[in-house]
Amino acid sequence: RTVQVMISGAKHIPPQPYLVPKEMENLFIWYNENKDKLHPVELSAEMHERLVTIHPFIDGNGRTSRLLMNLILLQNGFPIAILKGDTESRLKYYSALESAQTENKKQPFLQLIGDNVKETMERIINISEK
């Protein structure tokens, strides 16, 4: 992106446009350094959080970060994380994301993604048992 963006209702302010290319380069350096060290669920959640924090696009950052997260999960044999769209689930998601972005408290976000992957796995098991 070439303009500064703000996220409505969020405390996090994305980096200035001139910083985005370097931030994106750093993101993929981090990915290459950690892809074989972290559990795939943790890796996918970290990439989601890091990409949406950089906010490299004017629009579609959340969708793109969820696609990237789910690609990493699928590449590693896990089901996609289905993030529910109801009000309570969205508030939990935004709260956990904001803690990661503004306080560097990543555990709530990692747990949220892990719980969603687990729920998807349980649904698949329940369907296959029927």
Task: Please name every model-derived segment.
Residues 1-130:
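FIC/Doc superfamily catalytic core
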